[in-house]
Design a protein with these regions (language model features):
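Cysteine-nucleophile active-site neighborhood
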Residues: 4-70
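Active-site-proximal cofactor/substrate-binding loop regions of enzyme domains
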Residues: 1
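Acyltransferase
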Residues: 132-214
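Tryptophan-centric aromatic hotspots in well-structured domains and transmembrane helices
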Residues: 39, 64, 87-90, 142-143, ...
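Pocket-forming structural segment of enzyme catalytic cores
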Residues: 47-138, 206-210
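Soluble or luminal CAZymes and related metallo-dependent hydrolases
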Residues: 15-19, 110, 173-181
Length: 214
């Protein structure tokens, strides 16, 4: 479930909020594991677990370090202790709400960008607050778009252009960790999804989707 540039709005003011919730309701009984990206992650965390969105005065924009919080998690298998992750958002999540929920675990975290990867304990839902799916020039294109709009709360992208020179080709410094995340997640989904999908609701209800079945 992808993001959208609507994180500055209250959830109930997003035109498709009701449709978004209905998709999540359907997925909870029909989908083995769902990955949410950026606003999709914020919306799902709020609707499913009551995690509040926190509006930011300035956009978190650029490539930021994320520190592993669980070096033995299969989702981050192969990650270095520090992984770079692109971020591009005007909001975050209330970290106290995440910490207070026993169903949630923070897998990566950064001092500037906060949680970058969160998952449920059974991994039926994975929440990426950053953008490991971004291509090499995506942040550059977003920066040029926002500058053309005259947005004053968008800083120059952090740790992206060599020597902070926008005339130089940006560095694709997150590609290896992005590939690891997708491969780890898809391999787990492939290995553990039951042939009979009618078993999914029961497995999710019993929280039996985790690595104990891998």
């Amino acid at each position: 479930v992808t993001g959208a540039p609507v994180e500055h709005l209250p959830f109930d003011q997003v035109d498709y909020w009701d449709e978004f919730k209905s998709i999540l309701d359907w997925a909870s009984t029909h989908v083995f594991s769902t990955m949410y990206l950026c606003w999709g992650a914020m919306g799902a965390l709020n609707y499913r677990y009551g995690v509040r969105k926190v509006d930011l005065p300035e956009k978190i924009f650029g490539v930021f370090p994320q520190y592993l919080q669980d070096e033995y998690c299969f989702l981050t298998n192969g990650f270095d202790e520090i992984a770079l992750q692109p971020h591009s958002r005007l909001a975050g999540v209330n970290e106290a709400d995440v910490a207070a929920n026993p169903d949630l675990q923070v897998l990566t975290w950064g001092p500037q960008s906060g949680p970058g990867l969160i998952a449920t304990r059974d991994f039926s839902e994975v929440f990426a607050l950053g953008h490991w799916e971004y291509g090499k020039t995506t942040l550059q294109e977003e920066y040029e778009r926002d500058m053309a709009k005259g947005m004053s709360n968008v800083p120059f992208p952090h740790n992206y252009f060599p020597h902070d020179d926008p005339h130089l080709e940006p560095l694709f410094a997150w590609r290896s960790h992005a590939n690891l995340l997708w491969r780890n997640w898809l391999n787990w989904v492939y290995q553990t999804t039951p042939y009979d999908l009618t078993e999914v609701p029961g497995l999710r209800a019993e929280r039996r989707l985790g690595i104990d079945r891998f």
